[in-house]
Amino acid sequence: METQNTGTEDGFTPVTHRGGRRAKKRQAEQSSAAGQDGDAGRMDTEEARPAKRPVFPPLSGDQLLTGKEETRKIPVPANRYTPLKENWMKIFTPIVEHLGLQIRFNLKSRNVEIRTCKDTKDVSALTKAADFVKAFVLGFQVEDALALIRLDDLFLESFEITDVKPLKGDHLSRAIGRIAGKGGKTKFTIENVTRTRIVLADVKVHILGSFQNIKMARTAICNLILGNPPSKVYGNIRAVASRSADRF
């Protein structure tokens, strides 16, 4: 009675829940489910965290070349058949002995075919050999083209005179004459100052050298095509060459 009186005095009547066990069970299930969700979220975050950066040992040349044999084909124009035949041993020797590649001239397709083999140790050997043969086919001397195998920072660049200025007829012939000069003097001067090698084949110009030197030679040739006098071009390239020499 006292408890009832206190309950009535407070304004509340005590109520005993019959489903106490069910409520406890329900609360336990909810808490366990919430715990599992928390664990799952924690696992997701742990999986989402980037692991330590993997460190792999560098592969050797033999492991890199364990795939199929790679082949490069370089087409040879008709005007280069005779020079290729005369200089075949000079081309064959460095490619086979130094680079460890196989090379042959396919008489049916008129292509020089180069491929890797078991003796190939360097991955870049095939690209170097292809550039070497391509340079010779474009008209460079074997000794000059051989630098593509020995040095890594040499490149080939080709463009046409008509790409610089759309010339035709006698105007085109005069532009070619300005690039070559009397007895090849202008071409040799540009080669010596810029330390490049230049091949002038009709309307096509091929330049062999480093990136910066090719840029200087190309600028000089473009100025000659556009009509600048050779003396002015000489002065410009000498000034640029001296500045680049001081810089390095």
From Swiss-Prot:
Matching Pfam families: KH_PNO1_2nd
Domain of life: Eukaryota
Molecular function, one GO term: RNA binding
Lineage: Eukaryota, Metazoa, Chordata, Craniata, Vertebrata
InterPro entries according to UniProt: KH-I_PNO1_first, KH_dom, KH_dom_type_1_sf, KH_PNO1_2nd
Name of this protein: RNA-binding protein PNO1
SMART domains reported in the protein's UniProt record: KH (SM00322)
Localization terms from the record: Nucleus, Nucleolus
Family the entry assigns: Belongs to the PNO1 family.
SUBUNIT field: Part of the small subunit (SSU) processome, composed of more than 70 proteins and the RNA chaperone small nucleolar RNA (snoRNA) U3.
Region (Disordered): 1-63
CDD domains for this protein: KH-I_PNO1_rpt1 (cd22391), KH-I_PNO1_rpt2 (cd22392)
Role noted for this protein: Part of the small subunit (SSU) processome, first precursor of the small eukaryotic ribosomal subunit. During the assembly of the SSU processome in the nucleolus, many ribosome biogenesis factors, an RNA chaperone and ribosomal proteins associate with the nascent pre-rRNA and work in concert to generate RNA folding, modifications, rearrangements and cleavage as well as targeted degradation of pre-ribosomal RNA by the RNA exosome. Positively regulates dimethylation of two adjacent adenosines in the loop of a conserved hairpin near the 3'-end of 18S rRNA.
An individual GO BP term: ribosomal small subunit biogenesis
Keywords per UniProt: Nucleus, RNA-binding
One cellular component (GO) term of this entry: nucleolus
Compositional bias segments (type: Basic and acidic residues): 39-50
Domain KH: 169-221
Coiled coil: none
